[in-house]
Amino acid sequence: MSTVPPGPVPPPNPLPWEARESRGLIAAFFDTLGLLVTRPAEAWERMRETGDTTSPLLFGVAVCWLSTAVQGILIRAVGMPMLPPFLERRFGQWAAFGGGIFAVKLILAPIFIAIALFIGAAILHVCCMLVGALQNSRSGFEGSLRAVCYSEVSSLASIVPVVGPLVAVVWWIVLAVQGIERLHHTTSGKAVAAVLIPVVVCCGGLMLILLVAGAALLTRFGHH
């Protein structure tokens, strides 16, 4: 008789991406994407809590890579032709050179995306610890990693010009709060606090940098 303890039991109706072996890779990816966009609460409920860190990481990398690729293609296909003639002459050679950089960026992007997802999950997990959101958690760090990776479906909103990045940030916050609440079995208040701490710190840090840079410029020009 085997003495190896049984692994985590997957949900009876698993997330499509977590059953991609039977559903097919492409179909499972887009079914999961659609579920997170249209019925996120159901997606979080159907998600397993432990036993598979590969699936969320692969999904997060794939959806971020897709967003990066589409943004780059749209900029080159739509943005560059709309430039005035004098700017087109100035940036024409740069655009050709930039195409090569873009190709290299797409090749290397999965590595950097995966690293960023792990760092983001670690930061969020520490914030969950600070606010006491892990008291009833059975998933530990894996739950935080899942919340971060699957919430990256929001990055697709950044494809939309001007307002897209802001929508993506707000959407990510909403999804991450739902994910933390579900996967760590915590209250909505603690989930909101855990998610907003790094967001507020990042925004505050960015504003501080801008203020310091602005003050330095004013001081420099004030002496002339």
Predicted regions and their residues:
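Hydrophobic transmembrane alpha-helix segments characteristic of membrane transport
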Residues: 39, 44, 80-81, 125-131
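Helix-boundary and loop/linker segments of multi-pass membrane transporters
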Residues: 46-50, 91-99, 184-185
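Membrane-helix interface segments in multi-pass membrane proteins
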Residues: 70-113, 155-168, 202-224
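N-terminal juxtamembrane cytosolic/stromal segments of multi-pass membrane proteins
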Residues: 1-66, 70
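Hydrophobic alpha-helical membrane-embedded or membrane-associated segments
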Residues: 59, 63, 67, 113-117, ...
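Hydrophobic alpha-helical transmembrane segments and adjacent short intramembrane/lumenal linkers
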Residues: 97, 103-108, 120-207
